[in-house]
UniProtKB/Swiss-Prot annotation:
Its EC number is 2.5.1.6. GO terms for cellular component: cytoplasm. PROSITE patterns: ADOMET_SYNTHASE_1 (PS00376), ADOMET_SYNTHASE_2 (PS00377). It comes from Phaseolus lunatus (Lima bean). Disulfide bonds: none annotated. HAMAP family: S_AdoMet_synth1. This is S-adenosylmethionine synthase.
Length: 392
């Protein structure tokens, strides 16, 4: 058999302090967009023991109760007492929000006077989209499994299957792969790591048994597990203190978990708390759709797309495509197809992916368990676009 290699991806679940902050920032964005789709939002959140602070620049006609959003989001995650790491109803909430800088406003959207195709990028930057044919979601298996384990931890906590669970937790999966002429083929799961917050009464043996039975078994397909698979289940021994009590949290600290689990590449810009004029978010969404559509149309088995911007300029500065040698046609042809089928101007991304629509917890849903590879009609960038091109 071909030579194999190991690759690892991690995830954290919704009670992790950094992810709590992402969710609060996106809950604020949802509330603003729901009432005023033209809202300009750059909302950061930080948290530590008994404190949540929301700060940033927001220009909106929406009437938003920031403190209520903070408390509701914390409560829905399960932070209902100091024992679990934060008490949603009694913690201190600080709000320090100002309007968007008029300098940025005139340069980007001309104080709302520009037509959609004229709207400039909200900042400079470069974003990457990635897709691979190794899973039905066209996402890396290591990332998919780590993410699903985290989501399952939350599910069995909330439905009472494992009542000893507390909100905070982390997962990590190492997959053995072989490289099939540039495409990634998973062979087996090499290692599964879960560290989850738990209550005082449960024993380590109970934790390990429950995690295997109720979390790992339903998530990881049997064909990937064998007698050599290594399990590290709460390897530190105790994880009673968690959430913001255990560690400080900050929006935008989990950008690899939000994307491709270390595969592909990342331009460094976080997503949560940003409206669609911020290309960190909208640019990353459109290049995911481009890469996914290339792989779904079987033009390549694996694909990365990069786009870059200058502040105030609508047209991208560059678009790049690499299929890692898996393309059915040369990469320069695929690049042409990408440019012909996708409009990378921020105002047009907003329209084509319907990104100004808030409410329905739309962006809040993206803020835990990944922005990509999700089957949900609100994740419009996951829709495969039928590609049109001149076949030579």
């Amino acid at each position: 058999m071909a030579e194999t290699f190991l690759f690892t991806s991690e995830s954290v679940n919704e009670g992790h302090p950094d992810k709590l902050c992402d969710q609060i920032s996106d809950a604020v964005l949802d509330a603003c967009l729901e009432q005023d789709p033209e809202s300009k939002v750059a909302c950061e959140t930080c948290t530590k023991t008994n404190l949540v602070m929301v700060f940033g620049e927001i220009t909106t006609k929406a009437n938003v109760d920031y403190e209520k959003i903070v408390r509701d989001t914390c409560r829905n995650i399960g932070f209902i007492s100091n024992d679990v790491g934060l008490d949603a109803d009694n913690c201190k909430v600080l709000v320090n929000i100002e309007q968007q800088s008029p300098d940025i406003a005139q340069g980007v959207h001309g104080h709302l006077t520009k037509r959609p195709e004229e709207i400039g990028a909200g900042d400079q930057g470069h974003m990457f989209g990635y897709a691979t044919d190794e899973t039905p979601e066209l996402m890396p298996l290591s990332h998919v499994l780590a993410t699903k384990l985290g989501a399952r931890l939350t599910e069995v906590r909330k439905n009472g299957t494992c009542s000893w669970l507390r909100p905070d937790g982390k997962t990590q999966v190492t997959v053995e792969y072989y490289n099939d002429k540039g495409a990634m083929v998973p062979v087996r799961v090499h290692t599964v790591l879960i560290s989850t917050q738990h209550d005082e009464t449960v024993t380590n043996d109970e934790i390990a048994a429950d995690l295997k039975e109720h979390v790992i078994k339903p998530v990881i397909p049997e064909k990937y597990l064998d007698e050599k698979t290594i399990f590290h289940l709460n390897p530190s021994g105790r994880f009673v203190i968690g959430g913001p009590h255990g560690d400080a949290g900050l929006t935008g600290r989990k950008i690899i978990i939000d994307t491709y689990g270390g595969w592909g590449a990342h331009g460094g810009g976080a997503f949560s708390g940003k409206d669609p004029t911020k290309v960190d978010r909208s640019g990353a969404y459109i290049v995911r759709q481009a890469a996914k559509s290339i792989v779904a149309s079987e033009l390549a088995r694996r694909c990365i797309v990069q786009v870059s911007y200058a502040i105030g300029v609508p047209e991208p500065l560059s678009v790049f495509v690499d299929t890692y040698g898996t393309g059915k046609i040369p990469d320069k042809e695929i690049l042409k197809i990408v440019k012909e089928n996708f409009d990378f101007r921020p105002g047009m991304i907003s329209i084509n992916l319907d990104l100004k629509r808030g409410g329905n917890s739309r962006f809040l849903k993206t803020a835990a368990y990944g922005h990509f590879g999700r089957e949900d009609p609100d994740f419009t960038w996951e829709v495969v676009k039928p590609l049109k091109w001149e076949k030579a």
